[in-house]
């Protein structure tokens, strides 16, 4: 059974056209499916929660009847996400990760850091046929970002690509809140909005003293932090290759700290990251399962490019190994 969760507005409205193409393909193949088209924020997560909770209960009930034997495997239920990184992240935060379901992904967004990192085809026909004829799977890690909420309670958010504090979060926030972004999207000038966001973020960036604590043991201090990114995959912020040492499903985060006193060097570093260059001066990388990050100056934070617009000084990140079964 296939469950399609579609964001029709993803990719500046391209999501609906992509879904119509997919619908014609699966209709020709007489495939049984259910489709859920989102109409607003957080609806994708709500759909994912309902689908996966139902599948888990169904699986547990059937397994009990069959004396603990597995009644169905994850491959028999596939939840297909049609949207961008934001839609995927929303579904990740809504779904029951213990449900017997595999994930198919048709990337339609603008940044597409997840698809870029996994080297997924941008061709709709290619992706949907790979999902329908699923042969290759990969168990992906996901991360958890923890921050203090307004009421003092800890707030948790899952991420599949990256989470961070500082410049990378500021770039994401600027691009998402840019008034001309919808127009740039319709004109297929998404790179222009990304360029403006990066440029203005670098121009206004202020470094901070701070430190990271790795696995609760090793503390490393810095004098000029511009950003700290916890990477599960190589790319973030619409194609910036920050997490060069990030492994796919290795159970560890790649903590990338950019510390440099020169704003000119910062701009060069962002340009090199956007160009996929191998070496970035001032960028230090550490591997760990969990980390605490502190900066003396409050910075914006993000998870998978989604920033709430609130500045903070402390975040915690951790990695959950191999829980997302993905059709590659």
Indicate residue ranges for each PLM-predicted region:
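Catalytic core of DAGKc-family lipid kinases
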Residues: 97-224
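ATP/NTP phosphate-donor binding region
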Residues: 1-79, 89, 93, 97, ...
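Short acidic/glycine-rich loop or secondary-structure boundary segments that cap or lie
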Residues: 168-171, 220-222, 235-239, 263-267
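Short glycine-/acidic-enriched loop or helix-start segments at secondary-structure transitions
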Residues: 15, 90-92, 115-116, 170, ...
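Glycine-rich phosphate/pyrophosphate-binding beta-alpha loops
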Residues: 164, 168, 227-243, 307
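Short hydrophobic segments within beta-strands
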Residues: 5, 106, 256-258
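ATP/nucleoside-binding phosphotransfer catalytic cores, i.e., glycine-rich phosphate-binding loops
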Residues: 15, 214-216, 241-328
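Glycine-rich beta-strand-to-loop/alpha-helix junction loops that act as flexible
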Residues: 8, 82-84, 106-108
């Amino acid at each position: 059974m296939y469950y399609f969760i579609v964001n029709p507005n993803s990719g500046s409205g391209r999501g609906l056209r992509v879904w119509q193409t997919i619908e014609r393909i699966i209709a020709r193949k007489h495939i049984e499916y259910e489709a859920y088209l989102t109409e607003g924020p957080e609806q994708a997560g709500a759909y994912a929660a309902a689908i996966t909770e139902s599948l888990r209960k169904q699986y547990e009930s059937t397994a009990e009847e069959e004396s603990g034997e597995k009644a169905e495997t994850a491959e028999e239920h596939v939840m297909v996400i049609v949207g961008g990184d934001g839609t995927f992240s929303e579904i990740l935060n809504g779904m029951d990760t213990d449900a017997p379901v595999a994930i198919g992904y048709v990337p339609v967004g603008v940044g597409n850091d997840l698809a870029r990192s996994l080297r997924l085809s941008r061709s709709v026909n290619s992706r949907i046929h790979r999902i329908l004829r699923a042969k290759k799977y990969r168990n992906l890690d996901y991360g958890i970002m923890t921050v203090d909420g307004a009421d003092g309670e800890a707030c948790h958010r899952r991420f599949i690509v990256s989470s961070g504090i500082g410049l990378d979060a500021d770039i994401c926030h600027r691009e998402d809140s840019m008034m001309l972004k919808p127009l740039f999207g319709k004109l297929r000038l998404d790179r222009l909005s990304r360029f403006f966001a990066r440029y203005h973020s670098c121009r206004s960036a202020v470094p901070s003293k701070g430190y990271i604590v790795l696995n609760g043991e090793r503390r490393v201090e810095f004098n000029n932090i511009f950003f700290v990114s916890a990477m599960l995959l190589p790319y973030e912020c619409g194609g910036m290759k920050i997490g060069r040492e990030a492994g796919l499903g290795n159970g560890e985060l790649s903590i990338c700290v950019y510390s440099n006193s020169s704003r000119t060097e910062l701009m060069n570093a962002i340009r090199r990251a956007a160009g996929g260059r191998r070496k970035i001066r001032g960028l230090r990388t550490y591997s760990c399962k969990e980390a605490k990050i502190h900066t003396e100056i409050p910075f914006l934070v993000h998870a998978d490019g989604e920033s709430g617009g609130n500045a903070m000084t402390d975040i915690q990140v951790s990695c959950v190994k191999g829980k997302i079964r993905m059709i590659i």
